[in-house]
């Protein structure tokens, strides 16, 4: 079986840090919404027990690629009869270190797709636990619904924010999350808010001042967007986004972007494009993932 699957981007529409665990992980309150734009993964199931990424990324060792790690983790937890393997092709559109969740989304799509193609029968909670062992951002992609993520990202409350249009700018810099999260001046003690309070306050990313001060090129992109629309950082960066009510408004401003700005336009969606594909093919995500 050969199937192609989307691995969508995400935006953090707001992001706050409410504490820090003894193990160093930060406790968050963040609103995650998907974009109708992202990577694409093609998977061919095999019966030779090998997991192969046939177009490996030169910037990441294959053994460290989250797609390979996710596939091997599922392989170890799949009770399917006989040998199972996969040949995988990854089409990358989301830059590494951009705050758009590309690696986490790739891993989540790999887990969901291979769970189906290998007929492992794991439910959504099992897949989420596997994903969490690889990265805190992965569970929200597995559940596939816009959500308030709390804890280190594993506690999800589905919400329905407005589905706006976004002009996403991609500064030419890769930012490691730990670089920003370990910054001594990063605020880490914001009082936890109720969901109602979170939606009544102006959206804000607590990492934005640290990231823009550390990386002037990110500030340059953000200041340009702010001339035209409400704009913020996603994750710890480097990606920044401006929000619009209509596609035409977003395209009009994109037509004005300077030559040094790389960008794309996408719509915010509250159901992951991966789960929309499952529904369109009449395979409901709940039926696919829940036993």
Curated annotation (Swiss-Prot):
InterPro entries recorded: GHMP_kinase_C_sf, GHMP_kinase_N_dom, IspE, Ribosomal_Su5_D2-typ_SF, Ribsml_uS5_D2-typ_fold_subgr
Q: Name one GO biological process term.
A: terpenoid biosynthetic process
Question: What are this entry's molecular-function GO terms?
Answer: 4-(cytidine 5'-diphospho)-2-C-methyl-D-erythritol kinase activity; ATP binding
Signal peptide extent: none
Q: Which SUPFAM superfamilies match?
A: GHMP Kinase, C-terminal domain, Ribosomal protein S5 domain 2-like
List of residues binding ATP = 95-105
Catalytic positions are 10, 137
Give the metabolic or biological pathway: Isoprenoid biosynthesis; isopentenyl diphosphate biosynthesis via DXP pathway; isopentenyl diphosphate from 1-deoxy-D-xylulose 5-phosphate: step 3/6
Entry EC number(s)? 2.7.1.148
Catalytic activity line of the entry = 4-CDP-2-C-methyl-D-erythritol + ATP = 4-CDP-2-C-methyl-D-erythritol 2-phosphate + ADP + H(+)
Which Pfam family, just one, is annotated for this protein?
A: GHMP_kinases_N
Keywords, sorted A to Z: ATP-binding, Isoprene biosynthesis, Kinase, Nucleotide-binding, Transferase
Functional summary from the UniProt entry: Catalyzes the phosphorylation of the position 2 hydroxy group of 4-diphosphocytidyl-2C-methyl-D-erythritol.
What family does this chain come from, according to its entry? Belongs to the GHMP kinase family. IspE subfamily.
Q: Would you tell me the protein name for this molecule?
A: 4-diphosphocytidyl-2-C-methyl-D-erythritol kinase
Its source organism is Baumannia cicadellinicola subsp. Homalodisca coagulata
Q: What lineage does UniProt assign to this protein's organism?
A: Bacteria, Pseudomonadati, Pseudomonadota, Gammaproteobacteria, Candidatus Palibaumannia
The coding gene here is ispE
């Amino acid at each position: 079986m050969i199937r192609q699957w989307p691995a969508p981007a995400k935006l953090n529409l707001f992001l706050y840090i409410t504490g820090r665990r003894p193990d160093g992980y930060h406790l968050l309150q963040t609103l995650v919404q998907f974009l109708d734009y992202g990577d694409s993964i093609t998977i061919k199931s095999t019966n030779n027990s090998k997991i192969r990424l046939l177009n490996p990324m030169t910037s990441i060792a294959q053994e460290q690629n989250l797609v390979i790690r996710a596939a091997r983790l599922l392989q170890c937890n799949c009770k399917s009869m006989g040998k199972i393997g996969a040949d995988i092709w990854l089409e990358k559109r989301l830059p590494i270190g951009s705050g758009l969740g590309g690696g986490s989304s790739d891993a989540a799509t790999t887990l969901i797709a291979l769970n189906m193609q290998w007929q492992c029968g794991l439910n959504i909670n099992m897949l989420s636990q596997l994903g969490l062992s690889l990265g805190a951002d992965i569970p929200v992609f597995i559940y596939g619904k816009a959500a308030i993520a709390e804890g280190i990202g594993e506690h999800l409350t589905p919400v329905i924010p407005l589905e706006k249009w976004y002009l996403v700018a991609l500064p030419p810099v890769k930012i490691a999350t730990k670089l920003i999260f370990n910054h001594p001046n990063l605020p880490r003690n914001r009082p936890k808010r109720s969901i109602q309070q979170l939606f009544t306050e102006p959206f804000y990313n607590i990492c934005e001042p640290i990231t823009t001060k550390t990386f002037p090129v990110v500030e340059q992109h953000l200041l340009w967007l702010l001339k035209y629309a409400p704009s913020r950082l996603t994750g710890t960066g480097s990606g920044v986004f401006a929000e619009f009510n209509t596609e035409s408004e977003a395209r009009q401003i994109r037509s004005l972007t300077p030559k040094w700005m790389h960008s794309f336009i996408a719509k915010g969606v509250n159901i992951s494009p991966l789960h929309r594909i499952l529904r369109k093919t009449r395979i409901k995500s709940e039926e696919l993932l829940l036993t």
